[in-house]
Every structure is written in structure tokens, then in C-alpha cells.
Amino acid sequence: MRQARGNIDWQRGWLLLPLLLISLIWSSTADASWDQSLYRQLGLAGKLDKQTFRQALNSYQTVRHKRKPILTIIDYSKPSTQRRLFVIDMKRHKLLYHTWVSHGRNSGELAAKHFSNQLNSRQSSLGVYRTAETYLGKHGYSLRLDGLSPGKNSNARKRAIVVHGAAYANPTHLRKYDKLGRSWGCPALPKEQARAIIDTIKGGSVIYAHG
């Protein structure tokens, strides 16, 4: 009797396996379809690589204690001559900002090729951040960041890696020098846009820096 019951359970398990596989495939397909739909809705074709966008979405979804449905993507794989910062409203599915951003002095000239989590490296850091509080410092209105990627950006606070505005991060500097100026590792924004962007993303939104 026990053997017969065991055989029945074993057979049921095999019958359920295809259903489980179908469910997993459907879930994966649905996620990919949603990613592609949002990518099109935001008008990111030709501006941001699909795979980079998907990685940013995955990172956004894994961050705990988000307090704002805002995702900022920094694509350091692009040169500083291109607008490589994207601020996305994940609730309204809207691209709020698409603008320039500087990288660290020791990360490279035109493009960022070297990244570090070390103090005094003056390099940009990759990975996932959660935005924190604002303050007034030597660069004016600025935004502190907490690095959530161990070994990649976990020293962001100690390194004073913050979002701030800079005159060297705007199109005028770009036209004059054919590249943006560089920071000491901070994602520096065009001065005229910095306050508005900081106010949009401050207080618990997610930043994904790709390179």
C-alpha cells in the first residue's frame, strides 16, 4: 500500500514538472515583454542599450526600502560628449531627464575606463546606490549617496561621492573643450539642472551606474 502511494506521489511530481517549467518560462517571457514595452514607451532606442536598461530595472527591483519610484541610470560606457544620465519615473513610466554627467578625473579622459571603491582614488564607482539627504557644501546644493554594491561603491559615504552641479558638466564646456570636465569621483551634473534633478531623486530613490 505504501509503495503504491509512493508511486502515485512520484507520478504526480512528474506531471507537475512541465507545469512548473511552463510557469517559469511564461514569467520570464512576461518580464522581458514588460521591459521591452517600457523601453519603447520611454523612447530609449538609440539612447540607452537594452541590456543596460534591463540590468538597471533588475537592480531597481532588488533594492529594499525604496521611498521614491524613481530610477536614475548613469551609463559610463558612453563618452562624456553624450547625454548619459537618465531619470525615470517608474510609476508614471516617464523619462523626466536625459542629460550630461561627468565622471571621475582618474577614470579616464573622454570616457570612463577605470572605476574604484577606494578612498582618494578620484575615480567613479559603478553599482547600485540609494539617494539620501541633501546639504549645502563647496559645490552648492548636493545630494549624499549610499552605495549598496559591496566592493564596488560601498565607500561612497566615506569618499564623499555625491551628486552636485558643476560648470564643467554643461554643454558650454563641452563645445569649448570637446569633452566635459571631470570630478573627483562624483556624478556631476550641469549646474543649471542640478537642483531640479536633485530634488527629484533625493530621499530614497535608486541610482544604477553602469560601465
Please name every model-derived segment.
Residues 208-211:
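Low-complexity, Gly/Ser/Thr/Pro-rich intrinsically disordered linker/tail segments
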Residues 1-10:
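N-terminal secretory signal peptides that target proteins for export/translocation
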Residues 30-184, 191-205:
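Cell wall/extracellular polymer interaction/catalysis modules
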Residues 19-20, 30:
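Cleavable N-terminal signal peptides
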Residues 12-18:
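Sec-dependent signal peptide recognition
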